[in-house]
From Swiss-Prot:
Keywords assigned: Cell cycle, Cell division, Centromere, Chromosome, Chromosome partition, Coiled coil, Kinetochore, Mitosis
Complexes and interactors: Component of the MIS12 complex composed of MIS12, DSN1, NSL1 and PMF1. Also interacts with KNL1, CBX3, CBX5, NDC80 and ZWINT.
Name of the protein: Protein MIS12 homolog
Top-rank taxon: Eukaryota
Main location (coarse class): nucleus
Coiled coil: 108-205
Gene: MIS12
Keyword presence, Cell cycle: yes
TM regions (residue ranges): none
Subcellular location as annotated: Chromosome, Centromere, Kinetochore
Cellular component terms (Gene Ontology): cytosol; kinetochore; MIS12/MIND type complex; nucleus; outer kinetochore; spindle pole
Length: 205
């Protein structure tokens, strides 16, 4: 059997060519043994039909084994030649052929190409960092918008409650109610200012 590892062929076929040839050899050898056993059985049956035959089954077995050794020797010689033919011409990948997964090695990169590729990688990394920062900023802004939206919702709820209170007290227009509230607030503020002034005047006198 060949001692060449043929690793590239094994990568392509999924098995080593030597393993393939070994299985073929074992299959042929098993078939040869089966044929010789069948021939031996036929000879023994023929001898049973011959009266006063001096040939014993032991002699037949010895002759069968000798013939088997003779056939096996010739078979080994023929198979050795067949193996060389298969491994050199059939199960071998030519040196100028590349497998699909090795096509990238057909045109190797130069130092300039490598530097260009390295620069592209750095640019992509910077772009990724920028996009990541932008994403984080957008998420932060989204959180702020959620807070503002919640506060706006609270304000609208408050105005709705004021509107309901005004309606319960006979004020159907919320704007009128708000204007009235502001006016009353100013009146109260004026009264408070007058009270404070009068209080100061009394203290001075």
């Amino acid at each position: 059997m060949s001692v060449d590892p043929m690793t590239y062929e094994a990568q392509f076929f999924g098995f080593t060519p030597q393993t393939c040839m070994l299985r073929i050899y074992i299959a042929f050898q098993d078939y040869l043994f089966e044929v010789m056993q069948a021939v031996e059985q036929v000879i023994l049956k023929k001898l049973d039909g011959i009266p006063d035959c001096d040939i014993s089954p032991v002699q037949i077995r010895k002759c069968t084994e000798k013939f088997l050794c003779f056939m096996k020797g010739h078979f080994d010689n023929l198979f050795s030649k067949m193996e060389q033919l298969f491994l050199q011409l059939i199960l071998r990948i030519p040196s100028n052929i590349l497998l699909p997964e090795d096509k990238c090695k057909e045109t190797p990169y130069s130092e300039e190409d490598f530097q260009h590729l390295q620069k592209e990688i750095e640019q992509l990394q910077e772009k990724y960092k920028t996009e990541l920062c932008t994403k984080q900023a957008l998420l932060a802004e989204l959180e702020e918008q959620k807070i503002v939206q919640a506060k706006l919702k609270q304000t609208l709820t408050f105005f709705d409650e004021l509107h309901n209170v005004g309606r319960d007290h006979g004020t159907s227009d919320f704007r009128e109610s708000l204007v009235s509230l502001v006016q009353n607030s100013r009146k109260l503020q004026n009264i408070r200012d007058n009270v404070e002034k009068e209080s100061k005047r009394l203290k001075i006198s």
